[in-house]
Amino acid sequence: EEHKLKVAEAFLDDVGKGYARMDADDMIKMRVAPGDVVLITGRRSTVARAVQAPPSHCGQYLIMMDGNTRNNAQAGVDELVSVKKVPFKAANSVLLSPVQANQGVPTDEEIPHIRQLLQGLPVTIGDNLQITFLGARPRSYTVDGTNPRGAVLISSDTAIAFRAPEISAERAFRVSYEDIGGLDRE
């Protein structure tokens, strides 16, 4: 059963975990148990794991999500989203590509670390993920494919593959004044 809930910011401890915190009463109405996967639809649909909100956040028809989940749902704080329980499967494999064209593909040595960071995360094709490597800035990747299709949960057994970003001709040849040194007095 689909419900409309108002988007709120996630707790700091929930950032990057793919959680959607909701009032226990709202979860009961949707027949959602903690740990279930829910489909969240703003201007786009994404998936997250249902987690119970503390009593202080109850009775307000809120869904607490981190910035990445809000971006994937294309919904801002205080906007209404549709939420419903969806079936999910363990991901056999996930194909990711870097969001930035100049960002390389991780090495084979980095993939086990990435799998560990993404373990337990629900994803669907088209989602963007933030992966923070040790001591480095977060890197953004797009989910280009999943096996099976639909809502999947990344596990320790999920094969994670990367493909290089495709650079469009338009993007490859866009040059700015800064690229050529700007305009100085000659």
Map each language-model feature to its residues.
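Beta-strand/loop-dominated core regions that host nucleotide or nucleotide-derived cofactor-binding catalytic loops
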Residues: 1-176
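N-terminal pre-P-loop "Q-motif" helix
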Residues: 178-186
